[in-house]
Amino acid sequence: QNLFTMKKIFKIFAVLLILALVYLRIEIYPQLDLISGFSAKSVASGHFIDGRTLETIQQGDNDIDKVDWATNEINEAERFVTSKVHGLKERKAIYREGLGATLINDDFDISKPYNVPKRNKINNNLPFPYGNLEPKDTVFSNIDYQKLNAVVENAFDKKGQKDKRTRSVIVIYKDKIIAEKYADGFNKNSKILGWSMTKSLTATYFGILQKQGKFYIMKPAPIAEWKNDERSKITTNDLLHMNSGLDWEEDYGKIS
């Protein structure tokens, strides 16, 4: 009787184990490539571009579900990051001056020469927002600064919390900075991942230019390389939507 019971328990255990392995192979294993890839790119950008440590990136950026499975290593000499999940699906992200951090595959030739965009940064001696100098101190009588500062303070997590994860808040009124605050480890020179906020601000600036009559977003995008093929039909409005046209579901809990 005991032998029969043990055999039955063993069979049940074996079936459950097989089901678990099948689930891991079908549902989880394909995600490992994305997890290690995301982690490698995140660490490379945060470390080589913003100068943050691996520890702070792992605790403040990559401490999200599944991404925290990854193990990351930084190669300072050759400026790249490798990430893998329990030894599986290793991915590499490289840093190149002028291009930033790029996730690469096994066929990528790191030694291959590359072109760097020519970016001309013009500095002038005017105060913010018209130049690079510090803004002039201005106090507005119609602003309740105590209430404003309380609102800004409330945008950040209290010590030990990770609910809001706000990195920075800046409030501008009549071209003057009236409130400014940063999370620990960040300052006005930090290079912060913008996500969709970058897209929203870019679209806002083009909207202002359109209202001022200085730009028309429904015209073909002013890109010389696109003028003689089907891309000539792509407008600035299309680009501002940042939509690839691919059919996909924006669900970060599974593969789209």
Give the role of each language-model region:
Residues 1-5:
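Short, Lys/Arg-enriched N-terminal segments with co-localized hydrophobic residues
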